Amino acid sequence: MKNSADITVLGAGSYGTALAISLASNGHKTLLWGHDPVHMQTLAQDKCNQAFLPDIAFPDCLQIEADLAKALAASNNVLVVVPSHVFGTVLEQAKPLLRSDARIVWATKGLEPETGRLLQDVARDVLGEQYPLAVLSGPTFAKELAMGLPTAISVAGTCPQFTEDLVELLHSPKRLRVYANDDFTGLQLGGAVKNVIAIGAGMSDGIGFGANARTALITRGLVELTRLGEALGASTATFMGMAGLGDLVLTCTDNQSRNRRFGLALGKGCDVMTAQAEIGQVVEGYRNTKEVFTLAKRLGVEMPITEQIYQVLYQGKSPVDAAKELLGREKKSETPTQ
């Protein structure tokens, strides 16, 4: 079947829109679909996403499509950019409408709610084995990407040709550098764990602990990510790249990060509900914390920072008490995986 579009993007929030803008700016005909028909009609009329990325105009190659069937019929390349807790639901909706030659990539960062499973497992459960899968991950704030500011990400998947094609679609010498990676598991994991550590970094700054404490959290958070990755068979080298250290540093140090701002509010004394309301958008790290904690427990992986953040978010512990418990842990030697 011939493509009438080069790629279809499912998810018209800030990140999905930003990726669609970037793809269309490369000259690729891009369809953007979202679940809310009213929102999609507004996007089509305004030719920008005023709700999430105000005043960033859509390129001519970007087309809005409110009909999921039409969006999926237009291209065999499907980029899913929805919150992790609805990832499986969106795939279920898409499944009967997918083309036989469809190839699925996602930029969703997180794990399956309640189970802590990787999104590749969710995708396989829903879609079966017939479709090539891939993931995009790395240090990207939607606004900067949409504005065309220099950005770098990584892509990995189950099919080398699909990975190569995605690099060609996404890469732009002027705005976006894309690195191919062969660690499908590692790229998915990095995007989930960094959200958790960013909440911790925000809490630390909200309390007023300073740059030393924030840097320690980032560094030891990277150790926790690496431990968990090793338990799942991921490459440790991945976590020194865009989807590991890169995304971790970005999310922990800049207030464009919703997860960091959420943590800041908690550190300043807000309760969880109030802190979430202050952000006004999905805070992926809230659910990610429970998912990562569940996965670590199941695998027997020690993740003390993640555990303390889980206790703050779900068991009512104060951020100050969580910090005290981390500082009071038994002394140990520093090694790459401790």
From Swiss-Prot:
It comes from the Bacteria. It catalyses: sn-glycerol 3-phosphate + NAD(+) = dihydroxyacetone phosphate + NADH + H(+); sn-glycerol 3-phosphate + NADP(+) = dihydroxyacetone phosphate + NADPH + H(+). GO terms for cellular component: cytosol. Its EC number is 1.1.1.94. SUPFAM superfamilies: 6-phosphogluconate dehydrogenase C-terminal domain-like, NAD(P)-binding Rossmann-fold domains. Pfam families: NAD_Gly3P_dh_C, NAD_Gly3P_dh_N. The active site is at residue 194. It is found in: Cytoplasm. Sn-glycerol 3-phosphate binds at residues 109, 138, 140, 194, 247, 257-259. NADPH binds at residues 14-15, 35, 109, 142, 258, 282, 284. One of its GO terms (biological process) is glycerophospholipid biosynthetic process. One of its GO terms (molecular function) is NAD binding. The keyword Phosphoprotein does not apply. Pathway: Membrane lipid metabolism; glycerophospholipid metabolism. Keywords: Cytoplasm, Lipid biosynthesis, Lipid metabolism, NAD, NADP, Nucleotide-binding, Oxidoreductase, Phospholipid biosynthesis, Phospholipid metabolism. Gene3D superfamilies: N-(1-d-carboxylethyl)-l-norvaline Dehydrogenase, domain 2, NAD(P)-binding Rossmann-like Domain. Belongs to the NAD-dependent glycerol-3-phosphate dehydrogenase family. PANTHER family: GLYCEROL-3-PHOSPHATE DEHYDROGENASE (PTHR11728), GLYCEROL-3-PHOSPHATE DEHYDROGENASE [NAD(+)] 2, CHLOROPLASTIC (PTHR11728:SF1). HAMAP family: NAD_Glyc3P_dehydrog. Catalyzes the reduction of the glycolytic intermediate dihydroxyacetone phosphate (DHAP) to sn-glycerol 3-phosphate (G3P), the key precursor for phospholipid synthesis. This is Glycerol-3-phosphate dehydrogenase [NAD(P)+]. It comes from Shewanella sp. (strain W3-18-1).
